[in-house]
Amino acid sequence: MGNESNDQMFFEDLILLDKDFQNTNQFFDFTFPILKSGGYVNHSFLEAIKQRESSFPTALPTEPYVVAMPHTDVEHVIRPFIFFTRAKGTIPWREMANNDHVLKANFVFLLGFNQKDGHIDLLQKLMSCFVNSRFLEELYHAKTEHEIFTLLTSNINL
C-alpha cells in the first residue's frame, strides 16, 4: 500500500487526479471498486452512498473551487478513509444547502467513517480548510499524488 499518514485517513493510493466524470453516479461507480478491493468498504457501500447523496447532497459553494464531501452510514465502511479526487474539468454536483441548485465540483473528498460520533470533528476540520482559498489553489495546482498527500496531511490535522 502507498504512504499512510499517522491518522490513518489519508492514503496516497486513494488520491485520484484529473479524471473526467460526467456525473456523481459515474464517480461513485469508478471509486467503489478501488475502495472495495482495498478493504475500505462493504459491498453495500455503493448503493448506500448513491442513495445518501441523492437525499442529502454534499457540494459546497466554496471559492475559488467547489468541494463535495459525500459520505454514508458507518455500517458500510470497514476502515476509515478519505478518498481525494481532483476532477478533470468539473462534476455536476447538487449543493448541500440548496438541493435544487447544481454546482460544478472541482474536488471530491469521499469520506468513510466507521464510528458514529467521529465524523463531526473531521467535518469541521475539513470545512475550515475549504474556506482557505490558498489551500484550494494549492490542491488545484499540485502536480502529483504525493504532493496532494503532503498538502492534505500538513493542512488537515485529524
Language-model regions, residue ranges each:
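Cytosolic covalent-transfer regions centered on His/Cys nucleophiles
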Residues: M1-L158
